[in-house]
């Protein structure tokens, strides 16, 4: 209903419909900014994504409307090598060491990638023909939900993460904990911390 969805087609390629934009996520890298940058590749209308490709589809101009698309078309398919989005033709649980898992959803902080439920990024269950993000821990993998700036991706193809959010309710300033680098900590372990 907000103009974004994740898709995965197992047996057929996908032509990006008129008025739509498709995105794949190729990485996350730490730069000079406070937050990691996401490496996003953008495909406009008429581009053909190969079968077995998980992707995000934006149809921002017709939010909440059904779109018609063509699949199993002939033509030159785009290169999606390095795509970190995963999906399956059936509901599938993804897990494994060396990765953090994020589900694409319109959650409490808006459209973005979130750890699913209480899984803390250790796994995710993805519905049939939908996509999730499997980010290697060797990349800059944020511990909180994060959001890609799709508008900037259309312009630059490489974007920054807009922000991360604390799960503490607004206005509740009791017992705010910081580490010695000034970063807010929700669940401290042993060590020295700054309170409030």
Report the location of each language-model feature.
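Generic low-complexity segments that are intrinsically disordered, proline-rich and/or Lys/Arg-biased
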Residues: 18, 37, 137, 143-146, ...
């Amino acid at each position: 209903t907000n103009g974004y969805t994740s898709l995965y087609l197992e047996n057929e390629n996908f032509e990006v419909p008129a008025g739509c934009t498709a995105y794949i996520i190729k990485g996350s890298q730490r730069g000079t900014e406070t937050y990691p940058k996401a490496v996003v590749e953008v495909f406009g209308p008429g581009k053909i994504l190969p079968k077995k490709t998980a992707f995000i589809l934006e149809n921002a101009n017709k939010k909440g409307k059904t779109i018609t698309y063509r699949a199993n078309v002939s033509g030159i398919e785009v290169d999606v090598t390095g795509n970190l989005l995963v999906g399956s033709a059936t509901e599938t649980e993804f897990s494994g060491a060396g990765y953090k898992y994020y589900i694409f959803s319109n959650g409490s902080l808006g459209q973005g990638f979130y750890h699913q439920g209480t899984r803390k990024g250790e796994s995710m269950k993805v519905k049939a023909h939908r996509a999730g993000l499997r980010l290697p821990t060797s990349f800059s993998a944020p511990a909180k939900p994060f959001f890609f700036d799709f508008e900037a991706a259309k312009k630059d193809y490489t974007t920054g993460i807009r922000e991360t959010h604390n799960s503490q309710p607004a206005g509740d300033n009791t017992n705010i904990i910081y580490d010695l680098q000034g970063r807010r900590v929700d669940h401290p372990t042993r060590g020295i911390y700054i309170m409030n």
